[in-house]
Amino acid sequence: MYDQVTLGLNVDPFILSALKEDITSEDVSTNSVMPDSTPGVVDLICKEDGIICGLQVFERVFTLLDPSTRAEFYVKDGDHVENKQLVGKIYGDIRVLLCGERTALNYLQRMSGIATYTSQVAALLEGTGIKLLDTRKTTPNNRIFEKYSVRVGGGNNHRYNLSDGVLLKDNHIGAAGSVAKAVQMAKEYAPFVRKIEVEVENLDMVKEAVEAGADIIMLDNMTTEQLKESIDYIAGRAEIEVSGNVTKENIARLTGLGVNYVSSGALTHSAPIMDLSMKNLHPVE
C-alpha cells in the first residue's frame, strides 16, 4: 500500500525508465530551436472535470532531468478540478520543460483518470458498507502509480503483489486437485496470520470452501441469483468478495446483497485518461 511518502521513495527507477524510452540520445526538436539554456515557465491546465492525481510524480519527471526545476501547484492530489482550471505552473530550463512534457503528462493523465473513475464507482457504493478493491490487472511497471491512484479516488488496494496474501484462483485449485485440498495446503504453508481467500464459481465450490475453512470467499462471475444463493449458504461463516467484470455500469446490482468487498479490474485497466495539457510556455527573466 502506497501513500505520498512511500510513493516518493519508490518511483525514480520507473520514471527514469520512462524518460529513457522517450529520450534515447537527444530531443532533436527542442535542441534545434533552443540550443542554449533559457529559463521559462509553463501553465498546467485541466481540460475536463475530474479528480487530480499524480502531481508529485509529474514534478519528479522534471526534477530528475534538472533538480533546479520547480512546480507551483494550486491543488493537491484528490482535489476535484474543472475544465479550463489552472492547476499549476512549472518553472525551469525551457529545454527541460519541453523534453519532459510528454512523459510527465502521460503519468498525470493516467493517474488522474484512474482516480476519477474510481471516485465515480466508489460513489455508487457510498453508505453500503462495501469496500471497493482494485486488482493486479495493472500496466506492467506502473502498478505503484495505478494503485496509488485508486486510493486517491476513494478505493482500496487488494494485493499489491503475490507476496501480500493467499488468493487461490481456478488454476491453483486445478493444480491442487480440489478447493478443499488447495485450502488445506495453503493453511499448512502460509503463516497463521495470513487469511486464506479462495475464488469460486458455483454453489458446490462455495460449500467446499466453507467446509474447508476459507477466511474469504470470492464469488466470481456469478449471476445475481447465484450470488444470493451463495451468500445465504455462507451465512457469515466467511467474508465475501464479489468479482468478475464489475464496472461503473453494473456495480449497483451488488448492493444490498450482504457482501463485504467488491473488486474491479476496470479501475485500472479500463479507466479513461483525464485530459490535461501544458500551455503558454514562454521565457522569463
Describe these PLM feature segments:
Residues 2-212, 216, 225-233, 239-241, ...:
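Acidic/glycine-rich phosphate/pyrophosphate-binding loops and surrounding catalytic core
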Residues 221, 244, 265-266:
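Short secondary-structure boundary segments
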Residues 236-240, 281-285:
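Short acidic, glycine/proline-enriched helix-loop-strand junctions
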Residues 248:
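Cys/His-rich Zn2+-binding cysteine-cluster or related metal-binding knuckle/ribbon modules and their
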Residues 259, 266-267, 280-284:
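Acidic, glycine-rich flexible loop/linker segments
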Residues 272-281:
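Structured adenosyl-cofactor binding patch, chiefly the S-adenosyl-L-methionine
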